[in-house]
Each structure stands twice: as C-alpha cells, then as structure tokens.
Amino acid sequence: VTTADARCDVLVVGSGGAGMSAAIAAREAGASVIVITKSALGASNTGRAQGGIQAAIGADDTTEDHFEDTLSAGHDDGDPALVRTLVEGGPDAIAWLASIGVPFTHDDGDLRVIRCGGARRPRLLQAGERTGAEMVQALRAAVRASGAEVRESTSLEALEPAGDGWRALTRAKDGSTTPITASVVVLAAGGGLGGEAARIGEKSTNHPDATPEVLEMALALGAEGRDLDSWQRHPTGAVWPAGLAGYALPETTRSYGATLHDAAGERFVDELAPRDVVADAIIRVVEEGRGSAAPDGTMGAWLDTTAIDRDNGPGFTAERLAYVHNRYLKQGVDITKERVLVYPVLHYRNGGLVIDESGRTTLARLYAAGEITGGVHGTNRLMGNSLLDTVVFGRIAGSAAAREALA
C-alpha cells in the first residue's frame, strides 16, 4: 500500500544525536521538517555512549590543544577544516546541551572534566555515567517540542533526485510505503558498523538498527566517500561472562585507574594511549600467546578493575561506574573484587561521506552529519569526540539545510 506523498523543506534520515540535533536546528531556522527513523525516536548508538563528550572548556585547556590531539590521534588523516569546526564548536555545544536539559556532572560547582585516551588534558564532560542516554532524553524532548514531524518505525527504501530536491520512498513497519518530497535531505543514519559486524561474524557495540544501507545508498547515488574501511575497535570489549558479549567497558574505567595485564600479570601498554594503540596492543598480546582464556576458551587480556577502589578509595567504583558495576554484578562478577577479561570489539566507522564545514556532501542539496560522515576523526577517533560530532555537525547541517531549502 502506498499512501499519498508528503512534502517538507528538510527531511532528516536517522534520529541519533546528529539527526535530532539537525531536526531541532532546521526547525529553529524556520523550515518544515520530517524525521524518519527505523524504530523509536532516539534509538541509536548515541544512547549507548557511556563515557562522555569532549570539549575544551577547562581553564588550562584550549581548542588548539583539542585540535592537535584530534588530528594526532587520527594519524593526521582528518580534514583540518572539519576538525577545526568540531573543536571550536565544542564549548557552544556543551552550553546548548545544558540549555535543553542535559544534566552535566559538577564537582564543587564546576563541570567535572576527566582525561581520556589520546588527550593531553582533562577534557571529557559527563552527565552521570551514561552521557549518551542523558543526551538522547533531552534531545528527544526538544525534537518533540520543536514541531518537527517524527515518523517512527519508518525506513528509507530509496532516494532519488527530483527537480530542485529529493524524492524519498519510505516504508513503515506495516509494509506501507510513502513517498516524501523534500527540498533538502540530511542523512544522519550512522556508520552502520553493527551490520558490517554481522556480515563478518563479529560482535559489535552497536545498536541493532546500526546497519549501513543509507550510507550505501548515498554512495550508489554518487556521493563521495572516504576512509570507509577504517573501522575502530573499542579496546575493552567484555569477553566474559558470555552474557556481556558486545558490551564495552567505557574508557573512563581506565581513566579512573584500571590497568591492563597479560597472563603473567605484566602491564603492556599505556592505558590512556589512543584507542587503536591500546586495541592493537591487546590483540598482539593474545596473538603472541600471552593472553588469558575465559571458561569458554575465548581469549583476552586482564583489565584490573580492582585497582580503581584501591587508588581512589572504597565505594568509588560503585559511585562513578555504577552502570558498569551493576551490569557485571547481574552476571555474578564484582569488578571491585576481581579482574575482567577484555578484547577489542567493533565500535565505530571512522570514515564515511565526504562533507564540507557546512555538512554538505558532494551531491547537491544532500547534507550529512554524525558517524555517516568521514574526515572529522581521521582514521582513529578520540573517545568523546563522537558525541561532540553529532551535536556540532548535526546543528550545522540542520541550519545550513534549512537555509538552502528556504532560499
């Protein structure tokens, strides 16, 4: 069944942090907006992000330091103009998120910042210990309040140029299809690494909806891509218990003092090195026969989480890492009393669609933001930069798309 055509100024595909930020910005700029999302509004990888969001707001920090850290961690493969846009937009992104209700954590009246891998200074802000989930809650409410039309359980089936815009064919959960004609489209459907992991038989940290068909559709239309085969593995994916397969212990676990050890108990890497350095070191330890085996034979390295309370005092883990602590407790493991086995797990696509500083792809009237894009993170992303990316470039793309649609 095909229902009547719908029309809008801006069609946003995807409803993670980037899609919701884009929709809000486009509405603020006066455009009519339709958001389509495969399941519920906000169901995305954004909501799974535990660690935090980076922004240079500290008195001893600068956007220049953040810029250099981001480029360096990405092996200088990032687009400097995009990296500059990301980091310079950081402080304003935090202020905006706070204004829509994200409850950032404070210590003694100041925003708490901690240091994470690849960063020279404490720069990671948190909203409790599930920053992404708090962001999604605030963004979802802001989208609903903005007047954007949201079509849940609706996927993008096809996209084609139509006059001075685009015609999208969408499919609802009941199988009915609806064409949507839009002056401008913003793609914010993620990198789809969950689907890629399934294809090759690996686990991933991704949301079940994280499949790459929208990225592939844009590439098939002729949009230029970059670094598409650059996939990031989160260093500390849970190996055991089996019920935690695909779960990654957040990098803050290591920021707070957890250390990595081989089977002999020797440390083998700087735990706060960039993600690919730590992940490669764990893989190398296992390949060299220095790893340890879980009861089912799966290999990994030890993450000594017991060091956190030893270094910071009893109760620190239960307070600062309650979500991690409780997930393991439900599986019969107390991470304050025993080490856990970890091994890198597929996490993030570093590359994607080529965009400029306004979020424009190489196709007319087609914008993109978030993990579906490339160039922002080079070939290795810093922890906390993905949430920042969704907000900075989501807002930029939404505003620019609205301006073009209304011109």
Description of each model-found segment:
Residues D5-C8, G175-V184, T362-L363:
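Core beta-strand elements of the Rossmann-like FAD/NAD(P) dinucleotide-binding domain
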Residues V10-V35:
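N-terminal Rossmann-like FAD-binding beta1-loop-alpha1 element of flavoenzymes
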Residues E28-Q50:
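Glycine-rich FAD pyrophosphate-binding loop
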Residues L41, M217, A223-D334, A400, ...:
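An anion/pyrophosphate-binding glycine-rich loop and adjacent beta-alpha core
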Residues A55-L86:
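Glycine-rich active-site loop/strand segments that organize a redox cofactor
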Residues I100-S176, V184, A188-G192, A197, ...:
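Conserved redox-cofactor binding core of oxidoreductases
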Residues V184-G243, Y247, L387-A400:
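Glycine-rich loop(s) and the adjacent beta-strand/alpha-helix scaffold that form part
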Residues G190, R360-L382:
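Short FAD-binding loop at a beta-strand-to-alpha-helix junction that anchors the flavin cofactor
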